[in-house]
Amino acid sequence: MTAQEIIKELPKGLIKWYEFKKGTRALYIMGHGNLEQSLKESLMECGLYVECAAMDEVDGWAADEMEGRTVDGFYDRTLSGYEYILMSSAVEQAEPEAGLIKLLKKVRTLLKADGKLFLVTENRMAVRYFCGDKDPFTGRNFDGIENYKRVSAFDKKRLAGRLYSKAELTGILEQAGFPYHRFYSVFPDITSPQILFAEDYTPDEELDIRIFPQYHSPDTVFLEEENLYTSMIQNGLFHKMANGFLIECSLEAICSNASQITVSTERGKENALCTIIVRDGMVIKKPLYAEGRRKLGKLWENNCYLQRHGVRMIEGSLVDGTFVMPFVDGMSMVKHFRQLMAENKNEFLRQFDCLWNLILHSSEHVAYDAVDWDHFNPRWDEEKNELKQKKIDRSRWKKVAFGSDEDREALGAVLERGYIDLVLLNGFVVNGEYVFFDQELYVENLPAKAIMLRNIDLLYHGDTRMEVILPRKELLERYKLDSCIEIYYAHIGHFLNKLRNDDILYSYHLAHRRNHEIVHSNRQRMNYSAQEYQRLFVDIFKNLDNKKLYLFGSGNFARKFLALYRDEYEIAGVIDNNETKWGTAIEGIEIAAPSVLEGLDAGTYKVIICIKNYVGAFRQVRDLGAINIGIYDPNTEYPRRQGKVFNGPLSGTQVKKKYHIGYA
C-alpha cells in the first residue's frame, strides 16, 4: 500500500471494531472534515447500507419529511428508521451550542427506537493542548482550553468550528434527548486511533510505551504527554483529558460491552487487527479487513508452538472468525520489573535472567553453518545507494560467527523462529509466572539477543528512575549485548519498520509527531523572561569582542558548536565536570576543570554552555564568578560573524526563530 492509501485507512479503526447489524441502514451526516470519506467507507465495509447527507440538509428537513415519506433530491430515501447514524466533523461545525442541540434533536427523530447514534469529535480539554498543540480551528495555543474566551466575537463568526469538553458534550446530548451514552476516550488522535477506552474503564498498563502521540502542530509542543498519562489516571483526569471521543448514544439503555479496544490500521490490511476487552471477562481479537483472516490461524499456531517450548501463553480458541481469550487479571510485566528493580535489585536480576533463559528456549537454535550470512543484516538489501551497496562487507557477521569463542559468545544464539514481540509489553505476571499474549509474528534466523535488547529498551523507556537504580549499560554488559548491538538493532528496526510501515509513513509522522530536541528548546524558553531568553539563548555571541571564550561541555553539543563556529571565534578552552576528560582534548582544544575560571577577571571572558541539561552548569559557572554566559541550542541558527556571511550589519538577533510557542 502507498502512504496515501494507508493514511486513508487510519481513521477506520475508530468504528470497524464495532459489531454492527449487517444489512441495516445507516446515515452519515457530513460536515467539512478530513474523516468523512474514510468513515463512510468503514460503515460500508461493516456491511451497512450507507446514505449520506450534509449537515445543513438534515437541519433543513421539515417535520413531515421525517414521517416516512420519500423526498425528492435525497435519492428517494426514506427519512426515518435508521439503525445507525454517524456524525464526525458535523459535531464541531454545527452552530454552537444551541445549533448542535437542535441538530441532534432532529437526528433523534431519524433513529429507530433501538438505533444508535455515534459521534466522533476532538476534546477541547485534551492533554495534547496542555502540551502546546494548537487548536485546529483558531490555529493558536490554548484557545480551546480557555473555551475560546480570547477569540473576538468577529473572529468567532469566521471560525469553521469549535471543540467541546466531555462535560459540555454530555450536557448537549442530554438536552437533545439522548439520556443513554457511553464515551470512548481515543488516543492519540481521532484521525489515527491506536487505542480506545470506555469511560467506565480504568487502564492498568504502561501507556507511555504503547501510545505514539501526534499533533496538529508538533513544532509548538513543549511537554511529552505520555509522561502525564499515569498521573491523569491516578487523579481521575484520564477520560476528561482524552485527545478525542467516540460517543455511542442510544434511546434505550443498551450500549456496547467493550471496555478497551486496541487497533492497528497502520499495519496494512493483511496485518491490521483489533483487540477488544469486553465486560464479561473475555478478550476478542479479530481482523479489521477480510485480507487479515489468516492472521488468527497463525496466532493460534504460534501460541501452540511457544507452549511446546515452555513459554506460557494465554489460552485462546478460534470462534467464528475471532480469537477468543480469557481476560487475565495480572500485573503487567513492565510494571512488575520496574517495581522489582526499585525494591530488590538482586531479585530483579535473578528474574530477568529467567526471562533471558525463556527467550533462549523459545525456539530451536540454528547452526551457524546453516545461516545465510550474506543477508544476515536485513538492512543491507534495503540500501538504495549503489556505491554504498558495493561497500557492504557481507562476510562481516560470518567472520564473527566463525571467529573466536569470545566472538561467538558475543553474537549469541540464532533462533529458528525469533518471536520478536516476546517482550514485557505483551506479558503479565500471574502467580509468579510469566504469561504472554499477542505473538502474531516471528522472524526467521533472528539473534536471540535482539529480543532481549527490546526488553531492556522497553524497561527503561520514559522512566528515568531506572537508569539511576541500575544503569542500562550494566544490563547490556550482563547479557553481552554491547559488542554486537548494531546487528540486533538492524533486525529490530527492520521488523518494526515493516510491521508499522514506518518507512512508508515517514513524511506523515514527520508532520504530526514531535521532535524531542524541539520540545526541549520550546520548554527551556518558558523558564525565562523574554529579555533573559534573548540574552542567554539568542545573543550568545554578543559582546564577545576582546573576551576569551570558554565552552562548558565536551559532548555532541560542543562538537557541533566547534564544527560551525571555531573558524570564526577563538576558543580559549573547554571545561567539563568529567574528571576523566581533564588533560585530554576535543578537536585539538584541551579540556580542563571548571575551576580554571576561578581568579579570572569576570569581564575578560564568556562561557557558552554546550550541554543539554544546562541548569546545573549555569549555576556552577555563575558561582565561579562568570557574568557573561550563553547557552547553545543546536536547533537554533545563529548569525555568522560579520564579514563571513552577511554583507550588512548584524542585528544581534537570530537569523530565524525556527520554532515558537504561543499565538501564531
Where are these regions (language model features)?
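Conserved alpha-helix/loop element of class I SAM-dependent methyltransferases that forms part
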Residues: 2-24, 533-538
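Conserved structural core of kinase catalytic domains
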Residues: 314-402
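Hydrophobic, well-ordered beta-alpha structural blocks that scaffold small-molecule cofactor pockets
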Residues: 508-664
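ATP-binding glycine-rich loop module of kinase domains
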Residues: 260-305, 326, 333-337
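Conserved class I S-adenosyl-L-methionine
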Residues: 119-143
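Catalytic activation segment of kinase domains across protein kinase-like and atypical kinase folds
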Residues: 138, 143, 397-468
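A short glycine-rich, Lys/Arg-flanked "PGG" loop and its adjoining helix->strand segment in the class I
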Residues: 99-116
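Short alpha-helix
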Residues: 157-183
